[in-house]
Amino acid sequence: MATYKVTLIDAEGTTTTIDCPDDTYILDAAEEAGLDLPYSCRAGACSTCAGKLVTGTIDQSDQSFLDDDQVEAGYVLTCVAYPTSDVTIETHKEEDLY
């Protein structure tokens, strides 16, 4: 099992870096680290937890909400995203999807 550095940039521009194992969803790791990120369904079926991937790679094959264009644009649902490298994600991006 690998552990990656996940850097989260919130709506105010505050940057927090956490450790996230490759078998743990980014949202879950953030909560364990004491961060308060938006979420609703926790199943990849809505957009409440949406973020934007700045650098790195993730596996969000469990998500069912984002369309191909949104995925290609870098949007990520943190509730069903596993890191596959060190990543930087801008959080609180639900409004940008619409």
Swiss-Prot record:
Binding site for [2Fe-2S] cluster: C41, C46, C49, C79
Keyword Transit peptide: no
Cofactor note: Binds 1 [2Fe-2S] cluster.
Limits of the 2Fe-2S ferredoxin-type domain: 4-95
GO molecular function, a single term: metal ion binding
Similarity remark: Belongs to the 2Fe2S plant-type ferredoxin family.
Cofactor(s) named in the record: [2Fe-2S] cluster
A Gene Ontology biological process term: electron transport chain
Electron transport keyword on record: yes
Transmembrane segments: none
InterPro entries associated with the record: 2Fe-2S_ferredoxin-like_sf, 2Fe-2S_ferredoxin-type, 2Fe2S_fd_BS, Beta-grasp_dom_sf, Fd_pln
Keywords: 2Fe-2S, Electron transport, Iron, Iron-sulfur, Metal-binding, Transport
Protein name in the entry: Ferredoxin-1
Pfam families: Fer2
SUPFAM superfamilies in UniProt: 2Fe-2S ferredoxin-like (SSF54292)
